[in-house]
Amino acid sequence: MTAPQEPVDPIQDAGVEAPDLQAEIDALRAELAAAQAQAQAHQEQALRAMAEAENVRRRAQEDVSKARKFGIESFAESLVPVKDSLEAALAQPEQTAQALREGVEVTLKQLNGAFERNMLKDIAPAQGDKFDPHLHQAISSVPAPQPANTVVQLLQKGYVIADRTLRPALVVVSAGQG
């Protein structure tokens, strides 16, 4: 029978002193703890950044929603006096044609003022103006002495708001010499 062997310590067997290894293990544990703390801090920072981005996105959506909801408020406010004038005209008993016409002219001036304050402008091309597909809609083309693609007749005014066409002017254009 062989005698039981004493347990062999691999550290001592490798010729390394235990206190040196323990110091290295302690240093590595400290580095690991520092790295874990840094990773945790970075993760919390990333979560805060994601939450802030979500808050910014939500606020932007709310701003867009409010702009859509209340963007027309100024225009609507400028139309209220026009409506008041029309109602007052209808409330007047037995008006003469001349008085009615004058009232309509005043009301039209109010409406034009409201349009102007809200950057809504007429598109009313004159006869001979060059056809612009961004501002005009050709309803028909007729032989005419004017060069091709020029306005011969305005059928209905169009409108632009700021620089955007709200409704194109309806026009008849020249097909050129017939």
UniProtKB/Swiss-Prot annotation:
InterPro entries in alphabetical order? GrpE, GrpE_coiled_coil, GrpE_head
Please state where this protein is localized. Cytoplasm
**What is the recorded function of this protein according to its Swiss-Prot or TrEMBL entry?**
Participates actively in the response to hyperosmotic and heat shock by preventing the aggregation of stress-denatured proteins, in association with DnaK and GrpE. It is the nucleotide exchange factor for DnaK and may function as a thermosensor. Unfolded proteins bind initially to DnaJ; upon interaction with the DnaJ-bound protein, DnaK hydrolyzes its bound ATP, resulting in the formation of a stable complex. GrpE releases ADP from DnaK; ATP binding to DnaK triggers the release of the substrate protein, thus completing the reaction cycle.
Q: Which family does it belong to?
A: Belongs to the GrpE family.
List keywords of the entry alphabetically. Chaperone, Cytoplasm, Stress response
Q: Which GO terms describe its cellular component?
A: cytosol
Question: What's an example of a GO molecular-function annotation for this chain?
Answer: adenyl-nucleotide exchange factor activity
Determine if Cytoplasm is one of this entry's keywords. Answer: yes
Query: Which biological processes are named by the entry's GO terms?
Result: protein folding
Q: Which Gene3D superfamilies match?
A: 3.90.20.20, Head domain of nucleotide exchange factor GrpE
The species this protein belongs to is Bordetella avium (strain 197N)
Q: What is this protein called?
A: Protein GrpE
> What gene name is given for the protein in this entry?
grpE
